[in-house]
Regions:
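Bacterial N-terminal signal peptides that target proteins for export
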Residues: 1-11
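N-terminal leader/targeting pre-sequences
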Residues: 2, 18-179
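Sec-dependent N-terminal signal peptides
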Residues: 10-12, 17-19
Length: 179
């Protein structure tokens, strides 16, 4: 974990601890495992709250299949359904691409000048849980209306020159519509 990622987690955790009522005006999403057939079992929630430093993203997830870092993004559409791509179905394809209202078409990470939907990587512990808050400094709760949050199978490298077309975080594994 980079020093920047650790610092963001520390700031987010401090803000959440100091202001537990901050979620009164926030948003949340219940995440489900997604397949080519649609949504399956729930794996918990992610809460979103504004702070003076940006958007605090607080996961309360369990029973995740893969440990380590996972790319996490805000996607353009409030739909986690599968879509057909050629001869197969893409889990979560209806969520569209990363939220990119300025149409930068750049995958520069949460601190760069690309997609606004790029969030810091989610940390999944050995027991399959993810509870470490992160900070998305360029987003606010008001940006989240009509969107979905997606957790991918692999860590995001925030690189437009990778060899994977699913946002550099691997296949889509978990999705939730933000409310």
């Amino acid at each position: 974990m980079s020093i920047r990622t650790r610092w963001a987690a520390i700031v987010a955790a401090a803000a959440v601890t100091a202001c537990p009522a901050v979620y009164a005006a926030g948003a949340s999403a219940t995440l489900h495992h997604i397949t080519g057939e649609g949504e399956a079992e729930s794996v918990g929630t992610i809460r979103f709250a504004d702070s003076e430093h940006g958007l605090i993203v607080t996961p309360a997830l369990h029973d995740l299949q893969s440990r380590g870092l996972h790319g996490t993004h805000i996607h353009a559409n409030a739909d986690c359904g599968a879509t057909r791509m050629g001869d197969h179905k893409m889990p979560g394809g209806a969520a569209g691409g990363h939220y990119d209202p300025e149409q930068t078409e750049r995958h520069a990470g949460p601190y760069g000048d690309g997609h606004l939907g790029d969030l810091p990587n989610l940390t999944v512990e050995a027991d399959g849980s993810a509870t470490t808050p992160v900070l998305a400094p360029r987003l606010t709760v008001s940006d989240l209306a009509g969107r979905a949050v997606m957790v991918h199978a692999e860590a995001d490298r925030y690189d437009d020159h990778g060899d994977h077309h699913h946002g550099k975080g691997g296949v889509r594994m978990y999705c939730g519509v933000i409310e």
